[in-house]
From Swiss-Prot:
This is Alpha-conotoxin-like PnMGMR-02. Residues 48-50 are annotated as: Ser-Xaa-Pro motif, crucial for potent interaction with nAChR. The record marks L54 as: Direct interaction with nAChR alpha-7 subunit. The modification Cysteine amide is found at C60. It comes from Conus pennaceus (Feathered cone).
């Protein structure tokens, strides 16, 4: 393989790695935010109070 071809393959690998890393990072951001909200509501005791639990059914189940 020539140097130009090896360099092109290297650039493609770097680009593919960057794209996969970027999209997987963005996908996990939503999960992290939801977990943080659930922890905050639980710590504050929201789920034990009926009005709060009714306004947050996604978190209090």
């Amino acid at each position: 393989m020539g140097m130009r071809m090896m360099f092109t393959v290297f650039l493609l690998v770097v680009l593919a790695t960057t794209v996969v890393s970027f999209t997987s990072d963005r996908a996990s951001d939503g999960g992290n935010a939801a977990a943080s909200d659930l922890i905050a509501l639980t710590i504050k005791g929201c789920c034990s109070r009926p009005p709060c639990a009714l306004s947050n059914p996604d978190y209090c189940g």
